[in-house]
Amino acid sequence: MLTSPEPKGLVPFTTESLELIENHIAKKCNEDPEEEEGLKPSRNLEAGKRLPIPYGTLPRGTVSEPLEDVDPYYYVKRNTFMVLNRSRVIFRFNAVSIFCTLSPLNSLRRAAIKALVHPLFRLLILISVLTDSILMCMSNLPEWILAIENTLLGIYAFEILVKVIARGIWAGSFSFLGDLWNWLDFSVTLFELITRFSPLSSFLMLKTIRTFRILKIIPLNHGLQSIVMTLAQCLKKLFGAIALALFFLAVFSLLGMGLFMGNLKHKCLRWPEENENETLHNRTGSLNYSPERINFYYMEGAKYALLCGNRTDAGQCPEGYVCVKEGTNPDNGFTSFDNFGWSLLAMFRLMTQDYPELLYHQILYASGKVYMIFFVMISFWFAFYLTSLFLGILTMTYEKEKQRACEESGGLDPKCQQTVKELDEENDAAEMETTQIEMKKRSPTSINTTLDILEDTTLGHREEPETSRKKCPICWHKFIKTCFIWKCSPCWVKLNEFADRVITHPLADLFLVICIVLNICFLALEHFPMSEELRSLLHVGNLVFIGIYTIEMILKIIAMHPYGYFQISWNIFDSILVVLELTEILLADVEGLAVLITVPLIFIKLGKYGPPFKSLMRILGSSLMALKDLVLLLCIFVYFSAVFGMKLFGRSYKDCVCHIKEDCQPQRWHMSDFLHAYMTVFRILCGEWIETLWECMEVAGQAWCIPFYMMVILIGNLLILYLFVTLVSSFSYYDATSEVNKEAKNLQLAMARIKSGINSMLLKLMCTERSVPTEATDQICDPSVKENISGHTLSELSNTQTFLRYKDQSSSTEKTPVTESESQSLIASPSASETVPIASGESDIENLDNKETRSKSGNGGSKEKMKQSSSSECSTVDIAISEEEEMVYEHEKSKLHKNGYERKSSTGQISRESRNGKIWKNIRKTCCKIVENSWFECFIGLVTLLCTGTLALEDIYIDQRKTTKILLEYADMIFAYIFILEMLLKWVAYGFKAFFSNNWYKLDFMVVIVFCLSLIGKTREDLNPLTSIKFLRALRVLSQFERMKVVLRALIKTTLPTVSVFLVCLMIWLLFSVIGVQLFAGKFYECIDPTKGERFPVFEVMNKSQCEKLLFNESMPWENAKLNFDNVGNGFLSLLQVATFNGWISIMNSAIDSVGVNMQPSFEYNLYMYSYFIIFVIFGLFLPLCMLIGVIIRNFNKQKIKQGGSNIFITVKQKKQYRALKKLLYADVQKPTPRPRNKFQGFLFDLVTHRVFNVIIILLICFQATTIMIQKDEQSPQMETAIFWMNSIFVMLFTLECILKLTAFRCHYFTSAWNVHDFMVVIFSITGLLLPLTIGQYFVPPSLVQLILLSRVIHILRPGKGPKVFHDLMLPLILALPALLNISLLIFLVMFIYAIFGMYNFAYVKKEAGINDVSNFETFGSSMLCLFQVTTFSGWDGMLDAIFNSQWSDCDPDKINPGTQVKGDCGSPSVGISYFVSYILISWLIIVNMYIVLIMEFLSIPSQKKSRTLSEDDFRRFFRVWNRFDPDRTQYIDSSKLSDFAAALDPPLFMAKPNKGQLVAMDLPMAAGDRIHCLDILLAFTKRVMGKDERVEKILSEIESGFMLANPFKITYEPITTTLKRKQEAVSATIIQRAYKSYRLRQNDKNVSDTPAIDDRRDDLTSKGAHSGKIEEKASIQTQI
């Protein structure tokens, strides 16, 4: 972007100014418009922004008066003038008086402009809009409110009138109708007038339009306008992604129609009895009698009939019922695939992952479990790929916007930056001078204290954003010195010094931290029910902590004086905490008044001593301040949506409530009032919208509900995703080691002193037991040594030589804390005593993060080689490894050194020269060769897979398959023997030390132990539980496959540094859990009617005592909710369900119904408890999620940089394939098919390769997809016949295409995979159509023929055939596939392990809630289905709810399970909680990295310059266009035709107009007559497309030599100039002419004036004319540059 020239003065807009603008408009008609094409508006001078500082203060007479525009873009091109208000805000108006626009000098317009730009006018409109917005959210308003609404309407009409007069109706971009916001304002006002004063007021839609008035807040705030414009740019960038999403949505919807049309109507209908006359025709037919609801089979507590299917893996009906297609679809008929509309809604539901488990179960019941593959594919494409795509585009847009803002702030208005810098320097100098004067006036005794105060104050200011401080009056300074800086008697000074020593001592901070932690622990101990002893203990502890905090505050005030104390923000925070806690003691009778405030403050107080917490909070605060406009826009949108929904659907929810509930009682989720409408919108934005949409369609119809919900979902998610991207980007710069505050340093110092004291005591004890040399002891006792040995172990302390060596190192360097790697380098390695040769194990680089491989020297620069304890002829000898090699996990094996294993034998060991030594050596060499043989490794890998796979066979039916059970028992023993043998071989080959120093071998050893324990468990019945650990055998897969090793290493390296951030997030959750316990402990109990299973109404049972007095109370109906806040642990689990939006609705319902402890809940009694969950979702879920993901991305980028920019989740071999694939995809080189020499075949070749032919085929595919869209279930026979003939026509057309291509391409046809696919589609389609006609049976259903034809729709994604934007969006996925596949393998292994564990522990759990016939843990397939749901964070609350059944009232522990010896159907709550929580955390971590891989791959595409290789066809098309511009074959073209020639070329050589600036910048040689040679143009255009490097230079030389061969008679010429020089000459001539004209104008003005006094305004006009000339001159130069 071009910068504006030096700022000129503010010139009033006069008649002469208007004449100049009119003359300029007349001149522009005769000049070349491209001379001003490069002139762009300055972003610092945009309308709505403040005038920059370099323009100085506003002179008198310039405020609210028309001024000449200071931006050359608007002055030269847009013909505008500007107006400034008192706040220096820029307003721009059109100066041309056309289309009912008054002159800028008209008094009426000037008065309107003054009113429009006045801040009070803007404030009046803002207050009116806010008042109107508040009134709109209220219901049942009194009559006098109508007068206020009429007044507000009058204000809006007056505003429109003022704007029309000031701006004109339609005269340029700054007219009234030139602003879209004015269109909205005018429309809303017009409709409001119609509804207020016309008979049309009864129309609901006209009344609803008034709610758009809320959006009027946006144009009143420039920041909101900027955010809206940014989001509009994001939508432009997202256009391709939205189109791709709609394409996939349509394709999968059609696929769903073909697979599941009509299936959801299959229900279990009662079989007619023998005495009934009705008969059943067939299993899929209909009964002769009309089925009623009573005839269907319903599960206990189910609302809809049980679905079934006729496949063996589908749902089965109980005895006495048959599966028939009758009735309506489930969910009130809104869930189906019977037509394209409902199928599209179902696919959109899966795309947003809203309640997908219900749809899974419905489809699997009706169609079969095999269709779970369809949902896995849908989840990958929609929930993963498209989400990553949207996030990637938003991230790229945000990064570009941030980069542009940085460039503007760094490059624009340097004078402004210099002015600000000078002002800052003056302020600093004045403050320093004032400080020196104050110091001179003070007494010497107070200087030290004041310095401490200043030091603390400075420290506090460093932790806060710097703000400008205003100078205070002298009297105020005297008052401060007298009242807030205490100078009393010497006793007070001593007390001051004592308090200062106490509060600054490191142990004081450690003591405070311990007290805060204990205070938090005391808060976390509260639970329900709680004994009186514990309650009193917690109360006393709370009083003690309050006393400690109060003493701390008093000591700090004494030590620092009140003035210094309150200069630090943390001290102010501490004082507030103390005041609130003292208030809590005084108001102890008011329950929960101050607790909810003090509890968060205590947690925040702990964060004072944690640098990660402070850093994260600082980043969060700065980010939210920078994003305040975006947050405000999101709040406005939510408010608008709630009000709009309330106005649109409120009456329908009241009048048609009986359509939802049979008892006609109000629902929890509706839009009858603002609060419920707001919560409904909030629930929609949280991703749960389908259930409320069903209810909305029941009461208000589909026509309004679906558009409203789509608006809220799409716009709301766009705002949330953009906010998410910006916050994640901010946290990606987090560095925990960047700063350590004073309190943290004190804690480190205190811990170091404690460790030093403990070590000194240990040294004394050891010195009494051993005789330590005096010199060594003296050196150890040196303070520098004591300070740095605190982190060493007892074995290190016993090594005196280590201390001596460390003493020498520490004396030559600064006293810095010893890092872990440095401390390990100080440990003396044991001497090698093995005399026999051994083989080294795998490279230590594979030991995850084994830090024994190398150590850093004291200077930290060089790496030392570790001394090998042993070696072998067949061993892999580790060499010195660089950091880069370690990061990519590449290592080399050095060649065998003949004497590498020769070591001196120590006493008592086997000698190498002895006979036994040689035998042992040969045995070890043989074992080494065996274990390192590739065939042996493949055999072990195969055995590992077989061993892991057999675990899937041990389901609940294993006892019924006796043979399989026996085979598995023998297989377990065989596998155990093989792995034991392998371990023994490695022990012999590598030795124990090398074996157990490798973490992967440790894992193998653990698996062997698991094998042994499981085999032992089978021998005795009392040891049978040991067999349940067999699932750990699958962990051996990790050590056998390099891909999983790479992924696991990368996960560890990207996750471990986030531990501090994870702890911060955990503390936030602990805070919310403690608050939840304070709010809801013991309040979720309710009295249940055992006959109905529902809660008693509150007017029948009010509390626990009344419930227990009921006569039929035999089963204790006073029950607690399974998810509650009775203690911190339950609170964590409840918050996890809220965070995953699973089961959170029931938790919120219990919370808002809660009345009190031992009180019966009442419907929506505590409605405002919704705020607790809203705050948690924002501050406990959204923001911590941004923190974690941002830090993970930072670590991901760090590891990626260390590996040279390559992907960290792929192996070395895959990296080579990745580079090759990347070059292939970016090069976009396609091997052309040779054109046949036969004329007929050549004609067909030209036909099928023509673009029009490809377009026709794409249109045919789209038409064929349209024929599927118009179909529906139970359509008429005429429709069936029409569709059959349309399918036949499409098959014939596609067959004709296949024949034409076969004839044209010949054998080359089958070299393309796309052609092979088309050929197979044609064959299957013909077969599907002809078989029914020949044999009369449909072996291939007609719907399947349509789906086969539909598969051709993927041609739209074909590179070069479909839209290019689709190809660009698919590139990241293709490039990221290797990494995604590796990560998928790891997550599949995790799912496999957890599925086996679930089969062992939850196979016999009672089928209830989320566990049913389809989703259970009985078999491996069902377990994987359950875990797939949990992986997408859906449905795990229902499974956990079923596992919670562990009491006699909920399950039967003695139930006999047929076919097995296991009894009972109870679950284990503790095991279930651990199972699901651990799996959610692990799977979330892996999935987040999958998202990051794909997003980073997408972001890397624009950062790399796409160097495209031009093909022969590109050059052929170039010369084809050249022939049109050079028909005489002169090899030259006139320079005036160059622009048209560049615009006529085909991509990638194509250059769109305006392109003169780009062509001039190419600096093309020109011959006589302003002609340019063909070769020069070709070479320049090729270089523009392919870039500049050595490879391109070679290609250019080849092009030039090829051109010379093809044109041997090239005309030689000498270029006389270039395009750039010629343009510079023309611009220079124009500048000279304009300068001369300006000079002549000034001379004429001097001659005309007869008096020496010249009108000031005329001088301004003259300077304006000269400056305007300069602006135009600079604009012309900048245009060409």
Curated annotation (Swiss-Prot):
Keywords: Cell membrane, Disulfide bond, Glycoprotein, Membrane, Phosphoprotein, Repeat, Transmembrane, Transmembrane helix
InterPro entries assigned to the protein according to its UniProt record, in alphabetical order: Ion_trans_dom (IPR005821), Na_channel_asu (IPR001696), Na_chnl_inactivation_gate (IPR044564), Na_trans_assoc_dom (IPR010526), VGCC_Ca_Na (IPR043203), Volt_channel_dom_sf (IPR027359)
IV repeat windows: 1233-1531
Single GO molecular function: sodium channel activity
Superkingdom of origin: Eukaryota
CDD domains named in the record: Na_channel_gate
Stretch list, region Disordered: 806-875, 1647-1681
I repeat extents: 101-402
Bilayer topology term: Multi-pass membrane protein
Ranges of compositional bias, category Polar residues: 806-834
Entry GO terms, CC: glial cell projection; plasma membrane; voltage-gated sodium channel complex
Residues linked to a glycan: 277, 282, 288, 310, 1103, 1113
Intramembrane segments: 340-367, 674-700, 1128-1154, 1421-1444
Compartments where found: Cell membrane
Modified residues (Phosphoserine): 843
Record-annotated disulphide pairs: 268-308, 658-664, 696-705, 1087-1107, 1451-1466
Physiological role: Sodium leak channel functioning as an osmosensor regulating sodium ion levels in various tissues and organs. While most sodium channels are voltage-gated, SCN7A is not and lets sodium flow through membrane along its concentration gradient. In glial cells of the central nervous system, senses body-fluid sodium levels and controls salt intake behavior as well as voluntary water intake through activation of nearby neurons to maintain appropriate sodium levels in the body. By mediating sodium influx into keratinocytes, also plays a role in skin barrier homeostasis.
Name assigned to this protein: Sodium channel protein type 7 subunit alpha
Species whose genome carries this gene: Mus musculus (Mouse)
